[in-house]
Amino acid sequence: IGSPKLSELAKGKENVVIICSDHTRPVPSKHIIPFMLKEIREGNPDAKITLLIATGFHRATTREELVGKFGEEIVDNECIAIHDSQDMDAMANIGTLPSGAPLLINKIAANADLLVSEGFIETHFFAGFSGGRKSILPGVSSKVTVLGNHCSKFIDSPYSRTGILEGNPIHKDMIAASKMAHQKYIVNVIIDADKKVVHAVAGDAIEAHAAGCKFLQDYCQVVPKKAADIAISTNGGYPLDQNMYQSVKGMTAAEAAAKDDGILIMVSNCGDGHGGEGFYEALKNCSSPADLMAEILKVPQDQTKPDQWEYQIQCRILMQHKVIYVMCEEHRKMAQEMGFAVANDVNEALEMAIKEKGKDAHISIIPDGVSVMVKKPE
């Protein structure tokens, strides 16, 4: 899409870098990367190829995880480097983003003659969609750049929502990062709930990604007939329902489906608890979500804290909605400390909500809040 074949792009390029997704992404890399390597070597048999693992803000990928992702043959025979966003010596400053934040990316990517990437496209609760340009930012960017991109001003934008790209300031910076880094070509897939590929796009980093997002929007967008008094959502079950931090994403689907004062019921096991110390402490210690939000919005872009965006989005939800958690018994007291109501099961949560909203309350049920794109009813 919008690009010559990868083999054509590789001609005359000595130093080729393929940015690859890390262990947190269910990308079928062992089926994608061999074809990308083959194409590159068809165009230039002598190309030096590096697989750069886009860990973003995550921990390093282990050898065992690499083998699971790529297979023994690729791990044993290809040059693989793992990005570390904390290692400033490994970064190159390649310019300033539209937001004013510096764009510091991994030197391996910055020094490439040809920079390409693989990945997958799914809905994203503040970048609109994952994939494409996200291989650069946050994928191979420094901590400074990632935090700047996730600043409170950007998260506060009404356009920083699931499925929205136009007007989204986070996306705007990511697109700029892609262009400044000269990300030339992508192979991105879309997968279903069973982790099977249902669609793939390849080509120009911007055009192919846009085409993939359009497919996904048509594939999974739901427009409720009317806003709900009570909206029930989940985080898709294991492994995405292990903690409250992760569960914010599924909660945003219920937020989109509900009236401004609607009650949200979040069904998520959260067996690992809160999932982020900063996330937990911020919500536990605030006098109210509104007061915490006011403090967050005062934080300058260059002083953004890790996890700040997650508790900012959680605050936004709690300022508008009562949230009832249906979760494991072990962590219910902690959830109450953070400002949530809790229930033993869905029936009890529904009884609590109906008691407030009445027997004629309109109820929306979202079986998997992380894989559906809910467009707010008009």
Q: Where are the predicted features?
A:
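Glycine-rich phosphate/diphosphate-binding loops that line cofactor/substrate pockets in enzymes
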Residues: 1-17, 41-47, 181, 222-230, ...
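Short glycine-rich or small-residue beta-strand-to-loop segments that form or flank ligand, phosphate
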Residues: 15-26, 50-56, 232-234
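Structural motif
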Residues: 17-19, 116-118, 229-234, 265, ...
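Histidine-anchored nucleotide/phosphate-binding helix
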Residues: 25-46, 247-257
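An acidic, phosphate/nucleotide-engaging active-site surface
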Residues: 61-129
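Conserved phosphate- and dinucleotide-binding cores of soluble alpha/beta proteins
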Residues: 95-97, 107-110, 114-187, 192-193, ...
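Membrane-embedded hairpin module used as a gating/binding unit in multi-pass transport
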Residues: 160-238
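C-terminal non-catalytic interaction/assembly regions of soluble proteins
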Residues: 247-248, 252-378
